[in-house]
Every structure is written in structure tokens, then in C-alpha cells.
Amino acid sequence: MTARLRPELAGLPVYVPGKNVPGSIKLASNETVYGPLPSVHAAIERAVAVVNRYPDNACVDLKAALAMHLGSDVAPEQIAVGSGSVTLCQQLVQITSAAGDEVMMGWRSFECYLPIVQVAGAIAVKVPLREHTYDLDAMLAAITDRTRLIFVCNPNNPTSTVVDPDALVRFVDAVPADILIAIDEAYVEYIRDGLLPNSLELALSRSNVVVLRTFSKAYGLAGLRVGYAIGHPELITALDKVVMPFAVTNVAQAAAIASLEASGELMARTDALVAERTRVSTALRDAGFELPPSQANFLWLPLGSRTEDFVQEAANARLVVRPFASEGVRVTIGAPAENDALLQFACDWIARTER
């Protein structure tokens, strides 16, 4: 390689997605097992017929549909659309943080935070989790005069936990008003047990709060890449200044609009997944696993030094799960038969290894 590249790239990790091994059960990427609803599939087919045309760069129809879906308090000018919420995370770093500035997050958390911060030349401040959950008090204590952006991944990926809703409000109120807080809610549709935060109210009533959501998880459009942000109009304008033109295809926009129109059917699927989450969690705990209560479409198994053995043995059993170094394993809740296969393996594994 003779071209001169930025030296910062030398220490930059390459994002490694969940493996896809033909013939195996994939429980590694937090995807829904359901395909598009018929109405969404039809919208996709109609949009494919005009892929010779550029998409609407402003996503006018999608923003209008989102505003209607989110409620009367949300206006289209308070919404930004991106090619998945991860690109909006990148845009947030771009509009807030320069070289030497600090971007804070709990850790372990969403892996993409680190590279997008490092590429910007900013400094990632990783605040350790407390009981697998974002430690908001510790994050407050870690704020400095260089802090520009704070990510709160809620539910947290990969540990599946949420922060207490009241604690989140207190945290937002305590953070200096010139620091942007990004509440990353990729898995918000799976939150139950009275733990759903009023994040939209936070974003609409405070100019330094932005909420990120996606169509990749509960809506099942991971392959089309559509995410959105809700925040103050000035913040949304700033996001639009750094967006890649035509990043959200017309197919993706059409599918997202159709999904919003069918949100009742899609949320019924989510209820079914939550029931499976409860079933699988209970069975794993009964078998001897320790895991935090999940509010996402996946479970976190904090296996520590046993992580590698679990992952390798799972692969031998044709199960693909997501390891995180020597910390633990993230397991997606799949279809009932897939979950049964996981339970059979996991129960056999723990019985064998804890003799």
C-alpha cells in the first residue's frame, strides 16, 4: 500500500457483524425472523419499478408519516432520516465533536460508537456499566469541559438492559445544556414491565436531547437501512447538513411508510417475541445461567472466561451466537423452534461444564 492514509486508522477496529453460516441457526445479529408483511412487500415491489430515479433526498413523505405515527406533538421538521440509525450516530459525532473533544458512552455498549468517534479524531470516554446497565451517576461524574456528546443506549446492546425512566430524566436535567444527549432506542419496541421512558417528551422539551430509532429491528427492515432521529429543529437542520445525499433509497422509504401503516400487525409480532423472551430467559435461569432481565430482542449471558468455549460448542451444534471477547455472549431471540435448539444446547452445555 503506497497511498498515505490517516495514522489514526492503524488502531481502528473493523466492525465484525454476526456470522452467517449456511445451514446453521443464526442467533447473532438481533434480526427479526419475520419477513415483510404483504402490504409492505407490495410497497417494496412498487418502489422497485422506479429505482431508475433518485429517491426523495428530504424524505418528505416518510417524515410526515413518522410525525403522524409519533403523535401530534411531533412535527416533520423535528425528524431526521438516515440510512439506519447508526449513520445518524455518525452524523451526531460530526456535528458536535472535533479532534480532542470527548464523546461519552457506557461500556460495554454498541460497538459502532467507538470507530465513529475515533474517525472524527474525538476521544471515546467509556464509563463502566453497573450490573450490566448504564451507570448514569458515574457518567455525570465523568463529564468534563471537553464533553460534547453522550450516548445512552437504551435498551443497551449487548447487555439487553434499560435504565430506570425516572433516573434518565434526572440525568438529562443534570447534564449541562450545551452537551448533546443521544438516547439510542433501536430496541424500544421490546421494552415492557413499566420501564418505557418518555424519551420523546425529553427530546421535544429540551434542545440538547435527541432520540434515535430504527426500522431494522421490530419492523424487520434491517436489509433496507432506515433509521430516524427526533430532536430540536436546529439540531435536525445540523444533521441534514452532514447527511450523505440520497442515502435512503426510495425502496427503503416506501417500505418504512408501509410498515408504519401496518404498525399494529407488526407490534403483535413483537408481543409474540417478548413472550418467547420470557420463556427462554426462564428456562436458562432454571438451568443455572445468570442473566440480566432483558428488555430487547436478545439475551446477555455474562459468561466471562467461559465465553469462548460456549461459542465454539454452539458452533459445533450449528448455532451461531455473538461473542464479546471474554465478557459474554449475546443471543438473539429467534423463532420458537430455533429457541428450542438453543435451550437444548445451552442446558446440556451448562450441565456438562459445571459438574
Curated annotation (Swiss-Prot):
Keywords: Aminotransferase, Pyridoxal phosphate, Transferase. The modification N6-(pyridoxal phosphate)lysine is found at K217. Signal peptide: none annotated. Gene3D superfamilies: Aspartate Aminotransferase, domain 1 (3.90.1150.10), Type I PLP-dependent aspartate aminotransferase-like (Major domain) (3.40.640.10). It catalyses: an aromatic L-alpha-amino acid + 2-oxoglutarate = an aromatic oxo-acid + L-glutamate. GO terms for biological process: L-histidine biosynthetic process. It comes from the Bacteria. InterPro entries: Aminotrans_II_pyridoxalP_BS (IPR001917), Aminotransferase_I/II_large (IPR004839), ArAT (IPR024892), HisP_aminotrans (IPR005861), HistidinolP_aminotransfase (IPR050106), PyrdxlP-dep_Trfase (IPR015424), PyrdxlP-dep_Trfase_major (IPR015421), PyrdxlP-dep_Trfase_small (IPR015422). CDD domains: AAT_like. GO terms for molecular function: aromatic-amino-acid transaminase activity; histidinol-phosphate transaminase activity; pyridoxal phosphate binding. Its cofactor is pyridoxal 5'-phosphate. Its EC number is 2.6.1.57. Homodimer. Aminotransferase that catalyzes the conversion of aromatic amino acids and 2-oxoglutarate into corresponding aromatic oxo acids and L-glutamate. Belongs to the class-II pyridoxal-phosphate-dependent aminotransferase family. HAMAP family: HisC_aminotrans_2 (MF_01023), Phe_aminotrans_2 (MF_01513). This is Aromatic amino acid aminotransferase. The lineage of its organism: Bacteria, Bacillati, Actinomycetota, Actinomycetes, Mycobacteriales. The gene is pat.
